[in-house]
């Protein structure tokens, strides 16, 4: 009798789990992204593209998921996940303990860090300590804001909802520096900002991006399996090399 009950419970649990993914496969998922974060996600013509976009496309193909990309400001993504208005999000979201209290993350898929960007003729700022007393452009709601408030409390932070606006503020001389995620800073310095700005150093390293989900989402385990598969079969390396020009 006991064995029968245990078996029934296990069968029920298995059915519930497979049913959760079946629901995910049947419905069109809303996947949020901040499309002003080159080269991870941005709009090219009428198409959304970037490392995160390609990675999610590969994951969705692996799991046979239907989805719709929902562009939104970065600072609206976590509230959207908390209210379950969105099913998942990829936007260079740093995995942090405070965020883990309100949302869930996949396994890390990219190691990042922060870098300092200054005008090309600026030779006075070379590291984080030099930001003390300076006006620094940063993106609202990011780990950069928390880090600078903690480590360089005398820096005067100027907040922007869009990192492109922060870079423009620097390029036009209205701030002393901009600090943001290393790959995005380097991309801007080598493209739109070339000849006007330069990267003078990293602020910190060891940050990781994760795909974000509402708390308790059954998709986390399945997405982690898909990530592992993509890394094992070489697909992740192909996507990485496409956007960063090197192997991870």
Each language-model region and where it sits:
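Periplasmic-binding protein-like
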Residues: 110-118, 182, 186-228, 246-248
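Sec/Tat signal peptide C-region and signal peptidase I cleavage site
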Residues: 18-26
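Alpha-to-beta junction loops
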Residues: 30, 64-66, 82-91, 134-135, ...
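A ligand-binding cleft/hinge motif common to bilobed small-molecule-binding domains
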Residues: 92-101, 147-150, 171, 176-205
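Flexible hinge/capping segments at coil-to-helix
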Residues: 119-136
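Short helix-initiation/N-cap motifs at beta->coil->alpha
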Residues: 68-79, 123, 140-143, 158-168, ...
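Extracytoplasmic small-molecule ligand-binding "clamshell" domains
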Residues: 26-92, 101, 233
């Amino acid at each position: 009798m006991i064995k029968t009950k245990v078996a029934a419970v296990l069968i029920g649990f298995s059915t519930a789990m497979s049913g959760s993914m079946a629901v995910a496969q049947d419905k069109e998922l809303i996947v949020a992204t901040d499309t002003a974060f080159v080269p991870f996600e941005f709009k090219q013509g009428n198409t959304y593209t970037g490392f995160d976009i390609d990675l999610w496309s590969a994951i969705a193909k692996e799991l046979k998921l239907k989805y719709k990309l929902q562009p939104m400001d970065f600072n609206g993504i976590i509230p959207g996940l908390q209210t379950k208005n969105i099913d998942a999000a990829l936007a260079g979201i740093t995995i942090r303990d405070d965020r883990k209290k309100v949302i869930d993350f996949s396994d890390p898929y990219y190691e990042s860090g922060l870098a300092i960007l200054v005008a090309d003729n600026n030779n006075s700022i070379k590291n984080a300590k030099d930001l003390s007393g300076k006006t620094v452009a940063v993106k609202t709601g990011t780990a950069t804001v928390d880090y600078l408030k903690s480590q360089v409390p005398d820096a005067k932070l100027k907040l922007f909802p869009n990192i492109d606006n922060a870079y423009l503020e620097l390029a036009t001389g209205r701030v002393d520096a901009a600090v943001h995620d290393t790959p995005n800073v380097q991309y801007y310095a080598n493209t739109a900002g070339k000849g006007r700005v330069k990267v003078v150093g990293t602020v910190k390293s060891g940050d990781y991006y994760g795909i974000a989900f509402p708390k308790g989402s059954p998709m986390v385990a399945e997405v982690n399996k898909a990530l592992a598969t993509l890394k094992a079969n070489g697909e992740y390396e192909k996507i990485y090399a496409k956007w960063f020009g090197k192997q991870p």
